From Swiss-Prot:
InterPro entries: TAF1C (IPR038801), TAF1C_beta-prop (IPR049087), TAF1C_C (IPR049089), TAF1C_HB (IPR049090), WD40/YVTN_repeat-like_dom_sf (IPR015943), WD40_repeat_dom_sf (IPR036322). The gene is Taf1c. Component of the transcription factor SL1/TIF-IB complex, which is involved in the assembly of the PIC (pre-initiation complex) during RNA polymerase I-dependent transcription. The rate of PIC formation probably is primarily dependent on the rate of association of SL1/TIF-IB with the rDNA promoter. SL1/TIF-IB is involved in stabilization of nucleolar transcription factor 1/UBTF on rDNA. Formation of SL1/TIF-IB excludes the association of TBP with TFIID subunits. Recruits RNA polymerase I to the rRNA gene promoter via interaction with RRN3. GO terms for molecular function: RNA polymerase I core promoter sequence-specific DNA binding; RNA polymerase I general transcription initiation factor activity. The keyword Phosphoprotein applies. The modification Phosphothreonine is found at T802. It comes from Mus musculus (Mouse). Gene3D superfamilies: YVTN repeat-like/Quinoprotein amine dehydrogenase. Residues 738-754, 803-828 have a biased composition (Polar residues). GO terms for cellular component: fibrillar center; nucleoplasm; RNA polymerase I transcription regulator complex; RNA polymerase transcription factor SL1 complex. This is TATA box-binding protein-associated factor RNA polymerase I subunit C. Residues 662-683, 703-836 are annotated as: Disordered. Component of the transcription factor SL1/TIF-IB complex, composed of TBP and at least TAF1A, TAF1B, TAF1C and TAF1D. In the complex interacts directly with TBP, TAF1A and TAF1B. Interaction of the SL1/TIF-IB subunits with TBP excludes interaction of TBP with the transcription factor IID (TFIID) subunits. Interacts with MYC and RRN3. Interacts with p53/TP53; the interaction prevents the association of SL1/TIF-IB with UBTF and represses RNA polymerase I transcription.
Amino acid sequence: MDFPGTLRPSLFKAGPLGMTDGPDLSFMCSWRDALTLPGSQPQNCKDPTLSFAKNLLWEPSTPGPLPLLMPPDPDPWDPGVTAQDFLFRGGHCYQYQSQAVLDVTEQLSRFLWDHGDIAFAPLGRLMLENFRLEGNRGYSKKMTIVSAKKLLQDLGGHQPWGCPWASLSRRLRRFSIVGGPVLSRSVSLLMGKLLHEELAMRWEQLLMDEAFTGGALAWLPGRTARAGQLVYPSGGALDKLYFQEVSVTSGGNPRILENPGHVQLRGPVRQVVTSTVQGETLLAVRSDYHCATWKIDKQGPPALLQVMQVEKGATGISLSPHLSGELAICSRSGAVCLWTPQAGLQTIYKDTETLAFRDPSPWRWADFTAHPRVLTVGDRTGVKMVDIQGPPGCGLLLFRAGAEAACQKGERVLLAQYLGQPGQTPPSLHLICTQFSIYLMDERLPLVPMLKWDHGLPSAPLLARLLPPASPGHPRPLLLGGQGGQLQLLHITGEGTSMPQLAGPPQSLPSITESLSAFPLLEPKKQQLLQERLEAPVIGLAAVPLCASAPGLLLFQLSAAGDVFYQHLRLLQASSPRKVPEQATAPSVDQVSTPSWTPQASARCSRWLEDLMELSPTRPLWVAPTFSHRRFLGHMERQKSQETMPQKLRAAMAKGQLLRPGDLSTLPRAEPPPAPQCSQQDELTERLTEAWEGRVTAWWRRHRGETSETQTQSKRPKRRTQLSSTFSSFTSYLDSPDASSAPRSQDLSTSEARLQSPRVPPSQELTQEVWGQGVKRERRQTLRDHTDKLPLKRDTPGPVATPPSQASSLQTMSFRQQTPVHSGSQPPQKKPRMGF
């Protein structure tokens, strides 16, 4: 823990520059001005690795990474919202490609819930005279009246200006003119402010997604040096943690041993960390609101140790390189917790404010140091060392994004990683990554970077891996991975008391997008799908040093789509320290042979592409979002009803869904309970019975005689003449003194028994009263007395034999009862012959 020999201890300051009892150095713009040492370094401090470090060069075996596994899951991968979906510049052009739809349902529901007084207060003003909510279809010539019904139909496909699908109708223009002063602008102003904040947050998330800081891919060593396990998430939601057995061949190519095992989680996997202490390997996984720890057994499946829930959301985890089982967890609330198998979970640090200056980001990070009881806590403004055994608030600022490190304006901390490794003398170096530079900090010299280098990556470097040297005496490789898939390889020298330095120029490695040339040429739409798949953000990085005669590295990369790619790097023979003299220079790019695609690599890419095309369905065309659900629901119900039962069964079997009885056909309606039996058959009982069974409307129509009226309405004009003559014949028959009353009574009773039911409906009683309208005044009383004496019911419902001579009288009586004839409707007719 001594100071490096190349630095003079008198230059060490106990605090920030300009804040100590020493000379005032606050006027200096950077630490370079304060640490300029005259003279040369001592001869005994010369690093032997610098003599050949400039000749280090790693050569990839292929022009780009190759897919290791087949497309993992049948769930289609959605690339999400891109920068082109937020920005629209230039004129309108027809879109041949499907676009992402910005779903603001969650944001709108939060707005209505949080600001309901502002959102719903102006709606009462729609009842004024300027708006017609549900009016007639008549055309209104008044330009100051807006139809709300037509307006809602226009809003169903409306998009604001600046969108390629924008449209503005006349009614919307009138609504803007009339509704502006009426509805006020409080809703639009508040909604615009919240929408601007949401778009700014989405834009920052596109530039840098901090959820996958640290990487979600890890390598677990196996029983041999050439075998191990890859731990990575997969699936459409990245909620399945896979353990894939991999072995490395003598040529440096990975080989899959068996089908991977997986663990189903409740959320997407954001970070995977491994650590081996005293022969015991632990695995820690971070999700959005949960963290879990497993103990890895080389002979059996992993054993779960603990699952912890983080209420405010976890931002980072780290495993201790000193004590087995220690896990540091950071949350968005500003708290840092330490979990151990013996003591459980305990809070060691909590501060809602940032370290150096105010920054709105809730991101927090924690890692271990060379001392087992000292941790580093970082945010966007700096990194602080905290002693967990000391009083609360005790600590020392290790790095600050400011003038001490010569930071640029707007530069923020993205990653803070401890570079110590178990089994060796623990160094005191820490890696600090920002969006512009990387810094190497020494715990013994806070606030003063040992090394600063501008990496120049176009995307945020959220992944970093420090590897052991390829051979004894070689510098240690440091891999930097950007979120966009860019890779850079650095070499760091400096052990013991020597200062850390960069050995040789940094080297850029091929990215996943450069593997597009290995795939066969496809149709434009499929080619675009493949290109989007290869351009997916990289969320995981792992490296395995190869123990072979020729030093090499095997790199694994995990994309956001769940695809794992690998790449083999080999160290050029000219980089050996034994064969290259001190004056030698690095081989130029022209001298290095350009790698080409081998037939085996092309065949692997073709097989992977075939599986991808089978699993990737065609995305639906973009349609404008609608605010009205009436038409949409009707269309969906009609489309669902047209599907047959075999089609539903095939679709369910293809998706692996569970079918319910209601999915195949309509559910059977529950039968109403049986109506109670009643012995008394009267009008009230029948009406209650029909109402209990739900047929009261049909009973009422039958009761009023509407059913018989509709059946005889078509025959009424044809029978009018016959019925009129029959009524006249019946009247003359009653006036005839030759006819006796007994046969008439028998004929009428027989016709009543045949044509009527056991009870007399009120309709027939009304018909009997109407008979008197067609009879003269002096004969009405006689007809009424005769009809009152007629029997209404018969005990024997069977048919009664009638002599042939009475058939004409029976037919005449039946027709007379059914059709009344109003007086004065037709002139009096002569008495027909034979009584017909």
